[in-house]
């Protein structure tokens, strides 16, 4: 049977549910379980974590108290409106055992930013059902732990999408204006499996509809974890980065993303203009660590240019041959 109506009382805002509670396997979570709008909460059983730390006040973790939840591998379904009103929920981690998602489960979860899915059985998941309830940008990490993909990771970014009514006053009409390419990206699932090729094929649309920081996350995520990334798609992301290197470099420096700058070096995506601009930005920001990294990259690039120039010069130089004399 399911331990489906158990709540956790502790002082941490991170909830890690066990596989068993009171000897019962945790296979489902009840409707409204973590919602601030639970019905009949006074009848619910309260589970207190053994590793909870008390600071003089226990809190029932629900509603805006919830920031991160880790579901056990045994969980198969979550009930309707389970996270209703959990505005501060940011991260959700679960396995591909979870396949059933109740209606409105993520209503009001405007702060959710990250899903981590442990693919223990195969490549199917409930990601599409969850993403379908969320309009904001969501990062999804698929961690493959079985079969030929075991040990692989895919970091997939699903952009935001929303529409708004815009008034054309002279014509006295309203029309709908759409923002973000997220609607299209959320349709890249078939039979609960993500179609990587279709996902990658939408990037040209994203370039037109989404912001620079989103495009950086998307392209860098695919290059850093290139599971199911074709040569054509890889070149597409690389071409975008090279074509916008000044803006991307500035964004990475301003946001303090040394990992992003290191990826540009590792994938050999720097050009002289983009690197020099990034150095100027880092200098103005007085970020010593990033400045040192970029200066080292400049030195490395100069050495490579000198090496290439030397090889070119040698290739163009006529070869001296010994003259033969007949005595």
Set out the residue ranges of the language-model regions.
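Charge-dense, extended regions
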Residues: 280-327
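Short, charge-rich amphipathic alpha-helical segments embedded
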Residues: 266-281
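Active-site loops and adjacent core secondary-structure elements that bind or stabilize anionic groups
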Residues: 6
């Amino acid at each position: 049977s399911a331990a489906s109506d158990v709540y956790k009382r502790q002082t941490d805002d991170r909830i890690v549910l066990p596989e068993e509670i009171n000897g019962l396997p945790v296979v489902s979570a009840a409707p409204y379980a973590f919602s601030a709008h639970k019905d009949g909460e006074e009848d619910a059983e309260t589970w207190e974590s053994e590793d909870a730390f008390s600071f003089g006040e226990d809190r029932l973790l629900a509603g805006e108290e919830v920031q991160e939840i880790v579901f056990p591998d045994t969980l198969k379904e979550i009930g309707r409106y389970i996270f209703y009103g959990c505005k501060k929920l940011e991260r959700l981690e679960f396995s591909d055992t979870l396949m059933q998602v109740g209606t409105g489960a993520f209503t009001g979860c405007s702060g959710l930013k990250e899903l981590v899915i442990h693919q223990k059985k195969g490549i199917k998941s409930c990601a599409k059902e969850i993403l379908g309830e969320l309009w904001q940008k969501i990062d999804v990490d698929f961690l493959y732990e079985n079969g030929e993909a075991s040990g692989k990771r895919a970091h997939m970014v699903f952009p935001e999408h929303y529409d708004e009514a815009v008034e054309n006053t002279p014509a006295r009409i309203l029309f709908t204006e759409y923002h973000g390419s997220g609607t299209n990206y959320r349709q890249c699932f078939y039979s609960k499996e993500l179609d990587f090729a279709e996902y990658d094929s939408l990037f040209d649309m994203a370039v037109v509809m989404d912001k620079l920081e989103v495009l950086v996350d998307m392209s860098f995520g695919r290059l850093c974890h290139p599971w199911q990334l074709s040569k054509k798609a890889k070149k597409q992301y690389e071409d975008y980065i090279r074509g916008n290197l000044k803006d991307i470099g500035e964004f990475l420096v301003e946001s303090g993303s040394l990992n992003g700058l290191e990826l540009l070096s590792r994938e050999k995506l720097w050009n002289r203009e983009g690197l020099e601009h990034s150095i100027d930005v880092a200098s103005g920001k007085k970020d010593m660590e990033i400045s040192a990294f970029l200066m080292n990259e400049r030195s490395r690039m100069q050495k490579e240019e000198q090496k290439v120039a030397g090889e070119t010069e040698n290739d163009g130089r006529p070869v001296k041959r010994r003259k033969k004399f007949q005595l």
